[in-house]
A protein has these predicted regions:
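C-terminal alpha-helical cap/extension of soluble enzyme domains
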Residues: 78, 176-268
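Glycine/small-residue-rich loop that forms an oxyanion/phosphate-binding "nest" at active or ligand-binding sites
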Residues: 64-95
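Acidic (Asp/Glu)-rich catalytic clusters
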Residues: 19-23, 52-64, 83-88, 108-113, ...
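Hydrophobic faces of well-ordered beta-strands that scaffold small-molecule active sites
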Residues: 4-10, 27-29, 67-71, 93-95, ...
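Active-site-adjacent beta->alpha loops and helix N-cap segments on the catalytic face
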Residues: 35-58, 75-79, 97-116, 126-129, ...
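Catalytic cores of alpha/beta
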Residues: 13-22, 76-88, 103, 124-138, ...
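Glycine-rich phosphate-binding active-site loops on the catalytic face of alpha/beta enzymes
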Residues: 27-37, 89-103, 139-154, 203-224
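Conserved N-terminal beta1-alpha1 strand-loop-helix module at the mouth
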Residues: 1-66, 74, 260-268
Length: 268
């Protein structure tokens, strides 16, 4: 099985411990607030209010898991914020809404090898930058494609419809071609969601993705009964393992998934 990592957003140390026991590979602390309310506040999206103290608390309970921290978009406070999250225990720093190569270079310089660096590609400009000759990926360890903001920029109604846009698809294909580890979007339990977890898993495998965020549909399972949560995480991983061993089935399910995405977007 390829190095496929499950991530989940949390700032609760007790919950984080349960996530690690359930096989979640990365704990995700989300510090991003700058500009997010303006971009996403009118949509049914989660805007976290996490803190540096949350990074410290999760670092103490992460055990074998990695701790990913999404910081705010680059500005005059970025150096202090990056230094603080690394000192608090971040293993991976995720930069949202970057504007140009200069910001990437500056974050690489600030991190200085103390943590992994994951730029978040969530604009068409970022997609174009990544596919251009101007993109210098020295110091970039992996990428994540933020379908939420991409689908808003594309004026689409269904988040996964972003994957059908040629510019987004080209950027994802480029990541696969150059061997850059990447992930995109979120994933629901196997039989849940407008686009169920099994269908989303097939898209990830076909496109070469190796990371995914467990969606908020998993959270009630954890709150109600941790055993059910563990079972659903294990079930999703089993589906991924099965699909990895059957390229034909993966291709067929991914094709059906695209048809479902198109139908959902058209019906909105």
């Amino acid at each position: 099985m390829q190095d496929f990592k499950f991530m989940m957003i949390t700032n609760n140390p007790v919950e984080a411990s349960e996530l690690v026991k359930a096989g979640v590979d990365r704990l995700f602390v989300d510090l991003e607030l700058t500009g997010k309310e303006l971009r996403q506040g009118h949509r049914d999206t989660v805007i976290s209010h996490h803190s540096i103290q949350d990074v410290e608390a999760l670092s103490a309970v992460k055990q074998s898991a990695e701790l990913l921290v999404r910081i705010n978009p680059f500005d005059e406070n970025s150096k202090a914020e990056i230094d603080a999250v690394i000192e608090a225990g971040a293993d991976i720093v995720m930069l949202p809404m970057f504007r140009d190569q200069a910001q990437i270079d500056e974050v690489v310089r600030i991190i200085d090898g103390r943590a992994l660096f994951c730029p978040l590609i969530e604009t068409l400009d970022a997609c174009a930058w990544f596919c251009s000759d101007e993109a210098n990926l020295m110091g970039v360890d992996e990428l994540y494609f933020g379908l939420n903001d991409l689908h808003l920029e594309l004026n689409l109604r269904f988040m996964f419809a972003s994957l059908l846009d040629s510019r987004v698809a080209s950027a994802i294909a480029h990541a696969k071609d150059i061997g850059m580890p990447f992930g995109f979007g979120g994933i629901a339990p196997v039989d849940a969601g407008q686009l169920d977890g099994g269908s989303v898993a097939a898209l990830h495998l076909e496109l070469g993705s190796q990371r995914v965020i467990l969606s908020r549909m998993f959270r009630p399972l954890l709150s109600e009964n941790s055993t059910v949560f563990v079972e659903e995480v294990s079930r999703l991983r089993s589906v991924i393992e099965t699909l990895e061993g059957d390229a034909i089935a993966t291709s067929q399910l991914a094709r059906q998934s695209r048809q479902m995405i198109h139908a959902i977007e058209s019906d909105h």
